[in-house]
Amino acid sequence: MLLDLSEEHKEHLAFLPQVDTAVVAEFGRIAVEFLRRGSNPKIYEGAARKLNVSSDTIQHGVEGLTYLLTESSKLMISELDFQDSVFVLGFSEELNKLLLQLYLDNRKEIRTILNELAPRLPSYHSLEWRLDVQLASRSLRQQIKPAVTIKLHLDQNGDHSTHFLQTDPATLLHLVQQLEQALEEMKTNHCRRVVRSIK
C-alpha cells in the first residue's frame, strides 16, 4: 500500500534534500518528540538560526516528516512500499535510505504513542431490558403503544456507567436490523482490509 501524500505535504518535505543527512536525522528525532510532547517553537528557532532559514520552513519540514512517519506507522506499510512512497518525492538514494531507517527505527514507538493518544471509548458490560405495556384503561381512545426500556451498563477505563434508554419496538427492530447489516458488512473484503490496516 503506497502513501498518498498531498501537494502540501510534498512541499513541506521538499526542504529535506537541501540539508545534510545529519540534519534530517535530527529532524526525525524532533518529529518523534513532537508526537510525544507537542510542538516546541524554541527548537524550530534554534534550527532556523543554524541553517539560515525561517522557523516556519523548519516547522513545516518537521511536520511533513511527522506526517510521513505517522501515516506509514499507522498503516504498517512494508519497507518496499515505504521506499516506493518516498521515491515519488524525487529524493536522492542516500536520503531515501535515511528516511527508511528513520521509519524502521521509530515505527513501533510511533504506534505506541498513537495508541496512547487514541480516545478510550466506552465498552459494553451488560444490558437489562423491560417491556412496558398498558394493560387496561377506562378511557382508551388510541392504540396501545408498548415501550421497551433498556438499562445499558458500560465500562470506560475501569469506571462503570449506566444509561437508561426507552424506545418503541418498531424503532428497536429497525436499530437491530441496521446493526446486523453493519456486522454483515464487516465480513466484506474491503472492511477486512481496512481493519487490517488499522491494527
Curated annotation (Swiss-Prot):
CDD domains per record: Commd2
Annotated function: Scaffold protein in the commander complex that is essential for endosomal recycling of transmembrane cargos; the commander complex is composed of the CCC subcomplex and the retriever subcomplex. May modulate activity of cullin-RING E3 ubiquitin ligase (CRL) complexes. May down-regulate activation of NF-kappa-B.
Binding partners and assembly: Component of the commander complex consisting of the CCC subcomplex and the retriever subcomplex. Component of the CCC (COMMD/CCDC22/CCDC93) subcomplex consisting of COMMD1, COMMD2, COMMD3, COMMD4, COMMD5, COMMD6, COMMD7, COMMD8, COMMD9, COMMD10, CCDC22 and CCDC93; within the complex forms a heterodimer with COMMD3. Interacts with RELA, RELB, NFKB1/p105, NFKB2/p100. Interacts with CCDC22, CCDC93, SCNN1B, CUL3, CUL4B, CUL5, CUL7.
Entry's transmembrane regions: none
Species lineage: Eukaryota, Metazoa, Chordata, Craniata, Vertebrata
Similarity comment: Belongs to the COMM domain-containing protein 2 family.
GO annotations of cellular component type: cytoplasm
Species: Mus musculus
Name this polypeptide is given: COMM domain-containing protein 2
